[in-house]
């Protein structure tokens, strides 16, 4: 089950899904609340609503899942796993926020002073959401991707709810802590820098860390890997 990152939706995974299916696996991609085709008003989106949508889909599956999260929404992977530990085979964090119990994604994001996105994040107080200035798409998100991905992003990226990143995670060793987790570090990432990625997986150690010589979006630039 593949969980997209900030401002994105299920279209993230359109290059990797056929490859995973060709290897004999079933793949599930969803739009989180307020994103993509999900029509929840972005102002009403909370961490709990987002996690509830994930766990609802998890509950419909007959067996265990590998839950994969990108970027900010590593937090969704962790919180959903806490609520459904018996349904989890493993957790995979792709350049994702791996945040411990009692902390928020925002706390970790503000520490990442080497990233290039912050000056281009536009806050809308009326909807309590942000958008990203398209001028930074290429450099910040898709540096090693084809130009058509940037053009698609201009059409498909949407507002990102702020609330989800400012809500503290509630994780326990008994549930979240017993599920094997793996990290995929993107070595040329300018959105979630390698420094920040390393700091997170050293604080919450993983079974194994894989490294990709890629920017923030390897599902576009290196889908086979």
Language model segments and positions:
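Conserved HGGG/HGGXW glycine-rich cap/lid loop of the alpha/beta-hydrolase fold
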Residues: 1-37, 65
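Conserved alpha/beta-hydrolase fold motif
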Residues: 67-68, 91, 183
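Gly/Ala-rich beta-loop-alpha elbow adjacent to hydrolase catalytic centers
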Residues: 68-73, 77
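Active-site loop/oxyanion-hole signature of alpha/beta-hydrolase fold enzymes
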Residues: 26, 34-68, 82-83, 106-110
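Conserved loop-alpha-helix segment in the C-terminal half of the alpha/beta-hydrolase fold
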Residues: 187-213, 220
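Flexible "cap/lid" loop of the alpha/beta hydrolase fold
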Residues: 82, 86-88, 92-130, 134, ...
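Active-site nucleophile elbow and catalytic-triad environment of alpha/beta-hydrolase enzymes
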Residues: 152-175
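Short beta-strand/loop motif that positions the catalytic acidic residue
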Residues: 177, 183-185
């Amino acid at each position: 089950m593949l969980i997209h990152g900030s401002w994105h939706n299920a279209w993230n995974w359109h290059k990797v899904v056929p490859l995973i299916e060709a290897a004999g696996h079933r793949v599930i991609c969803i739009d989180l609340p307020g994103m993509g085709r999900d029509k929840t008003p972005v102002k009403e989106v909370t961490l709990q609503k987002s996690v509830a949508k994930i766990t609802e889909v998890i509950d419909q599956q007959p067996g265990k899942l590998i839950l994969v999260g990108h970027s900010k929404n590593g937090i969704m992977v962790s919180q959903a796993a806490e609520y459904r530990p018996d349904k989890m085979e493993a957790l995979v964090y792709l350049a994702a926020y791996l945040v411990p119990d009692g902390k928020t994604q925002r706390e970790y994001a503000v520490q990442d002073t080497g990233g290039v996105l912050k000056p281009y994040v536009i806050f809308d107080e009326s909807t309590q959401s942000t958008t990203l200035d398209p001028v930074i798409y290429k450099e910040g998100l898709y540096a090693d991707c084809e130009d058509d991905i940037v053009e698609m992003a201009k059409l498909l990226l949407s507002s990102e709810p702020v609330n989800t990143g400012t809500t503290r995670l509630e994780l326990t060793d008994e549930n979240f802590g017993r599920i094997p987790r793996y990290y995929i570090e993107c070595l040329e990432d300018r959105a979630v820098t390698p420094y920040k990625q390393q700091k997170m997986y050293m604080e919450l150690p993983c079974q194994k860390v894989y490294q990709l010589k890629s920017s923030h979006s390897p599902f576009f630039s290196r889908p086979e890997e």
